[in-house]
Amino acid sequence: MDEIQDIEGLTRRALQAISRIDTLRDLTKLKNDNLGSTSWLAKYSASIKILSQEKKPIIGKAVSEARRKILEACQDRDLALRLNAQNEQFTRETLDITALPTRIFPGARHPIHVLQDKILDFFLMRGWSVVEGPELESEWLNFDALNIGPFHPAREESDTIFAEPRSASMLLRTHTSPVQLRALVSNPLPLYCVSSGKVFRSDPLDATHTPVFHQLEGLVCDRNITLGHLKGTVEDLARYLFGAEVNLRMRCNYFPFTEPSAEFDISRDGIDWTEWGGCGLVNSKVLSMAGVDTVHYTGFAFGFGLERTLQFIHSLSDMRDIVEGDIRFSQQFGLK
């Protein structure tokens, strides 16, 4: 029959075309051309109903056989193309362990962390210990135990970030001084320790303020501790950080947790002074809160901000440069 020959011829051409297909997109198009609703096979299928009773089973069988062969060929070719694509991908992604490495541009350590490590090394070399404490602190340790009364302005929500619920009396610490209390309670005397970490204030971010900054504090509790020990420690640290030519002065001030108290300023020329931090002999009330025998033991404490210290070292005018995290800022100091 002519119809059988036509179907077999079209089937052979379709199978030959399928074997030459190189892409899945072309295979999909060819499959639609031969098996789709407007394909030649669809037309032969539609014509079966008008054939004679003798031809219907013969043509129907030929159409079914052609559809089966073409469908199987399309499936086999689809699998082969996908395997080829996968193998090509594996070849592209193969790691040549003998190849020379490409240059990797390293990140840069933030200057604050480098400065922090430098200061901690200063104290570790002198036999001090490094202590740490939580950033989420109790209101009692942050204020009451440091002789900061219930009506002190620092306890207002405009200055301090309290955690919810407010009744829990928990807050983001406003200074690292609570760490000193924890150290006094958990360590035997004499105690020489330093702590550093993030503190939090309700301040806007501008050229001179940031709501999150780094603070470093030192604490000594021993027999016969005097202001002379405090002054000598701060002076040694200043020379270590800023050079032997730096000028340091102390001004009387008031802090609830030290008595007497002072602020210390630094200057390169002895004329323009920059406030650096605060210090004093630890208030006997604070020592008593920690269970220290104030008859036989005294102590001193000091603290300062690392951001302000970094500003003075590198003559930085805008604190926002320090906190924005731009790697180019760190790299300009040669820190990697």
From Swiss-Prot:
Highest taxon in the source lineage: Bacteria
Chief location bin: cytoplasm
EC primary class? ligase
**What keywords appear on the UniProt entry?**
Aminoacyl-tRNA synthetase, ATP-binding, Cytoplasm, Ligase, Magnesium, Metal-binding, Nucleotide-binding, Protein biosynthesis
| Residue positions binding Mg(2+) | 259
Return the InterPro entries for the record: aa-tRNA-synth_II (IPR006195), aa-tRNA-synth_II/BPL/LPL (IPR045864), Phe-tRNA-synth_IIc_asu (IPR004529), Phe-tRNA_ligase_II_N (IPR004188), Phe_tRNA_ligase_alpha1_bac (IPR022911), Phenylalanyl-tRNA_Synthase (IPR002319), tRNA-bd_arm (IPR010978)
GO CC annotation:
cytoplasm
E.C. numbers: 6.1.1.20
Cofactor(s) annotated in UniProt: Mg(2+)
Looking at the Swiss-Prot or TrEMBL record, what is one Pfam family this protein matches? Phe_tRNA-synt_N
- GO BP annotation list: phenylalanyl-tRNA aminoacylation
How is its cofactor bound, per UniProt? Answer: Binds 2 magnesium ions per tetramer.
> Where found in the cell?
Cytoplasm
The UniProt catalytic activity note for this protein reads:
tRNA(Phe) + L-phenylalanine + ATP = L-phenylalanyl-tRNA(Phe) + AMP + diphosphate + H(+)
* Similarity comment: Belongs to the class-II aminoacyl-tRNA synthetase family. Phe-tRNA synthetase alpha subunit type 1 subfamily.
Entry's HAMAP family?
Phe_tRNA_synth_alpha1
Show the PANTHER family listed in the entry.
PHENYLALANINE--TRNA LIGASE, MITOCHONDRIAL, PHENYLALANYL-TRNA SYNTHETASE
Q: How does it assemble?
A: Tetramer of two alpha and two beta subunits.
Question: What is the protein named?
Answer: Phenylalanine--tRNA ligase alpha subunit
List the source organism: Tropheryma whipplei (strain TW08/27) (Whipple's bacillus)
